[in-house]
Swiss-Prot record:
InterPro entries: 7-CO-7-deazaguanine_synth-like, Aldolase_TIM, QueE_Cx14CxxC, rSAM. Substrate binds at residues 12-14, 27, 93, 216. Signal peptide: none annotated. It comes from Nitratidesulfovibrio vulgaris (strain ATCC 29579 / DSM 644 / CCUG 34227 / NCIMB 8303 / VKM B-1760 / Hildenborough) (Desulfovibrio vulgaris). This is 7-carboxy-7-deazaguanine synthase. Binds 1 [4Fe-4S] cluster. The cluster is coordinated with 3 cysteines and an exchangeable S-adenosyl-L-methionine. Binds 1 S-adenosyl-L-methionine per subunit. Its EC number is 4.3.99.3. Pathway: Purine metabolism; 7-cyano-7-deazaguanine biosynthesis. Mg(2+) binds at residue 51. SUPFAM superfamilies: Radical SAM enzymes. It catalyses: 6-carboxy-5,6,7,8-tetrahydropterin + H(+) = 7-carboxy-7-deazaguanine + NH4(+). Gene3D superfamilies: Aldolase class I.
Length: 216
């Protein structure tokens, strides 16, 4: 299988229950909910998307002809050797990573001692073997992934009721204030998310700490 990757980079996980953990991110190009082009944003399922996933021109990005080649590029992004008392953490994101992530790539990374995570919109079935699953549902879509480690809901999001996800088999329910609204809009989103979490204690507030820190 050929993989199209926007970028590969080493940073700290900024979101969710594993925030603060060092990881290599592999951002796949392409998504099934938006083309990524500005002129198509009004028709996108998630017009608030804040990610550039178009093309293969980012740092470490490119077209990789097979799983072994892509795995080698991911492993090379770690500034330390694998097997030094730490299990390397690889996060596949996008775009929509489930369109490209497959079992051969997962198996190679596992063979090198890596832990494999995915950040997905949940509309595409996942391959087996993923160690940590984060689903971020979008209004108007049907979930193909109804269980996992964390469900991360961007809020506010028109057309979604957070309580409708509480019966699904996720260990953690997270509410992430919507960005892309400007500083004032983000503040309002944070206030709404705080109010929801205070009134619904199954939910935890999830901030995008990497944006506050100014890291990728």
């Amino acid at each position: 299988m050929t993989y199209r990757v926007k970028e590969i980079f080493h940073t700290l996980q900024g979101e969710g229950m594993r925030a603060g953990r060092a990881a290599v991110f592999c951002r796949f190009s392409g998504c099934n909910l938006w083309t990524g082009w500005a002129q198509d944003r009004p028709a996108a399922v998630c017009p608030f998307c804040d990610t550039d996933f178009v093309g293969t021109d980012g740092p470490g990005g490119g077209v990789f002809e097979d799983a072994a080649t892509l795995a080698a590029a991911i492993l090379a992004a770690f500034p330390y050797k694998t097997g030094e008392g730490y299990r390397p953490y690889v996060v596949f994101t996008g775009g929509e990573p489930a369109l490209q992530l497959d079992r051969p790539l997962i198996d190679i990374l596992h063979a090198h001692g890596c832990e494999v995570a995915i950040e997905t919109n949940g509309t595409v079935r996942l391959p087996e073997g993923i160690d940590w699953v984060t689903v971020s549902p979008k209004a108007g879509t049907r979930l193909a992934v109804t269980s996992g480690d964390e469900l991360k809901l961007v809020w506010p999001q028109q057309g979604i009721c957070p309580e409708s996800y509480e019966s699904l088999a996720f260990t953690y329910l997270l509410m992430q204030p919507r960005d892309g609204l400007g500083d004032a809009g983000r503040g309002d989103a944070e206030s709404e998310a705080v109010r929801w979490c205070l009134a619904h204690p199954r939910w935890r507030l999830c901030l995008q700490t990497h944006k506050y820190l100014g890291i990728p």
